Amino acid sequence: MAAEIGNAKLAVMAARKVDDKRLHVLAVETEPTPKNCVRNGVVCKPTEVVAALNGLLKKLANRLGASVVITKIYVGLNAHTLRTTPVSVSRSVFDGERLTDDMLADLEQEARRQLPAEKQVLEVSAVTYMSNDNVVAQPHDVTGGSLQVTYAVANVDADVVDKLKQCVAQLPACALADYLIAPKTTAELLTTPDDRQGCAVVDFGAGCTSVTVFVDGALKHFAVIPLGGQHITADLITFGNLSEYEAESLKRQFGIKYADENTAKKYFQMADASDGTKRTLSIDDFKKVCVARLTEIVKYVMEQIAVCVPSDQLSAGLILTGGLTTMDNCAKIVAGIAGVSARIGSHAHWLTPDSVKQASHNEYAQLVGVLMQGNGGCVETQSKKKKRSGFKEIIGKMGEKMEDMFSEYK
């Protein structure tokens, strides 16, 4: 079982692993996130979020059958303060000295300690090993001089994790199995070993966009940008004088399509105002709004990529996923803005043919990625036989109490 707690939507998914290589997705339930309850991936109003999640889990359990009880759930962590921080540590190596695993573990702990106290370290990955200014493949091969290790330290504000734990703890009879780094699990889901020689996975969410960079087969960097599809919708509401429903509908139907194409059509005809006034929206203005915000998002994505690698070293380019990718010509527009090749990623090959169809949609890549990484079981099965024996046991105990009550009159 996995849950996504996003700015715009809450979603839960149930799946069974097949040979540890694919997922049989059994059911998906989703609904809009209660308004202003999650901001930039951080739970702000846990009571409302818990109530909505509990309702979704009940629906999910009903789909799985009366005998199935959901006891645990995995959650993807995707807050805007989630990122990797590069940290370098070094130590001297005496001539003839062999580095042990314990010595390397000490270096990793030193890297962890370099982050501020308000940050929670989620994971530490060695990116490069250098000895006497030369890159080495294996640190154990260093037998003298010095060793410098650069780590990618995955971290997030500690209160983000605390709020997530508090939220899940309020779910009745359902514990947190684990929280996983969503940008990383999604990126690993959508890439091949060849892709990871040089690529960036960009996940366009509603409130946040994540970017995960792989170079030379290893994860080099990831970050979450607090901008996403909701911001395009908000711009259309403001500049087009539209309702939220109108703005979201136009964005999904025409946003990227009209941003890229010349069309003889000059205006969108909107529903009349309450006083009968005719309402229209210039397609030129519509295009400018969509492209301006998307350009801003892609610009920040490219800045994060530049932190660790020149964009011309991304041999596999940008791999896109998330809600915005459902719009026509998304990859073409993004490639034009970024100056790097781009394509829409797919996780359908990880799913069995009998999985529910919606699970293959890009907006569910995060949930599928989290489930692929989860290892423990999340349900218990109650047999009818056990339920009957439990009922008989209760009746038996009631009988004993009744016997005790009347024993004094014997």
Tell what function each PLM region has.
Residues M1-K9, M13-A200, L219-K220, G229, ...:
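Nucleotide/phosphate-binding catalytic cleft detector across ATP-hydrolyzing
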Residues E4, T191, D203, E296, ...:
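Extended, folded domain segments that form the structural surfaces/walls around functional sites
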Residues V18, D195, I333-G339:
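Short, solvent-exposed amphipathic alpha-helical segments in soluble enzyme
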Residues N40, L189, A234-D235, L351-V356:
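Short, charged, surface-exposed secondary-structure boundary motifs
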Residues K184-L190, E296, V340-S341, G345-H347, ...:
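Long, low-complexity N-terminal extensions
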Residues Q197-F239:
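Glycine-rich phosphate-binding loop of actin/hexokinase-like ATP-binding domains
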Residues G255-Y258, Q313-I337:
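Glycine-rich phosphate-binding loops at beta-strand->alpha-helix junctions
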Residues S346-G396:
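Glycine-rich phosphate-binding/hydrolytic loop that grips phosphoryl groups
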